Amino acid sequence: MKEQKWIHEGLITESLPNGMFRVRLDNEDLILGYVSGKIRRSFIRILPGDRVKIEVSRYDSSRGRIIYRLRNKDSND
């Protein structure tokens, strides 16, 4: 049986080495996020200030996997 994960939205606050990021969730928690393989293969750039969807395990809520970069409402791309 596959493990259930929580999906949150948050804001990238800091970029760390090796594809790791500090993410502030909408509920004000600060967790460590790493880039999923699909985002890494697609060469999607994630920068501080971006909004992302992050998948958090029920067993370790201090780390999560970034699964989607949300589009900014004010950008024109």
Swiss-Prot record:
Span of domain S1-like: 1-71
InterPro entries xref list: NA-bd_OB-fold, RNA-binding_domain_S1_IF1, S1_domain, TIF_IF1
Name listed for the protein in its UniProt record: Translation initiation factor IF-1, chloroplastic
Cellular component, GO annotation: chloroplast; cytosol
PANTHER family: TRANSLATION INITIATION FACTOR IF-1, CHLOROPLASTIC
Protein source organism: Buxus microphylla (Littleleaf boxwood)
Lineage: Eukaryota, Viridiplantae, Streptophyta, Embryophyta, Tracheophyta
Subunit-level organization: Component of the 30S ribosomal translation pre-initiation complex which assembles on the 30S ribosome in the order IF-2 and IF-3, IF-1 and N-formylmethionyl-tRNA(fMet); mRNA recruitment can occur at any time during PIC assembly.
Family: Belongs to the IF-1 family.
